[in-house]
Curated annotation (Swiss-Prot):
Region (Interaction with DNA): 20-22, 54-57
GO cellular component terms listed in the entry, alphabetical order: chromosome; cytoplasm
Entry's localization field: Cytoplasm; Chromosome
Protein name, UniProt field: Archaeal histone HAN1 subunit A
Function: Binds and compact DNA (95 to 150 base pairs) to form nucleosome-like structures that contain positive DNA supercoils. Increases the resistance of DNA to thermal denaturation (in vitro).
Keyword DNA-binding: yes
S-S bonds: none
Family listed: Belongs to the archaeal histone HMF family.
Chief location category: cytoplasm
Keywords tagged on the record: Chromosome, Cytoplasm, DNA-binding
Oligomeric and partner information: Heterodimer. Dimers then assemble into higher oligomers, with the DNA wrapped around the protein core.
NCBIfam families cross-referenced by the UniProt entry: archaea_histone (NF043032)
Length: 67
């Protein structure tokens, strides 16, 4: 089960053009986004460690998304 709140996910889907969004759809997207964010976070952490830092910076996240 995703830790992300469902209401903001619902708003994102509506912002993308949907008129109505089922709770299951919002939950499914929340779960996917959480999994993706964790993977990006892991890669960003690797970039920070490789640079000799404990702190993950925005540039690490940008690189992780592109990797």
């Amino acid at each position: 089960m995703a830790e992300l709140p469902i209401a903001p996910i619902d708003r994102l889907i509506r912002k993308a053009g949907a008129e109505r969004v089922s709770e299951d759809a919002a939950k499914a997207l929340a779960e996917y986004l959480e999994e993706y964010a964790i993977e990006v976070g892991k890669k960003a952490t690797e970039f920070a460690r490789h640079a000799g830092r404990k702190t993950v910076k925005a540039e690490d996240v940008r690189l992780a998304v592109k990797a």
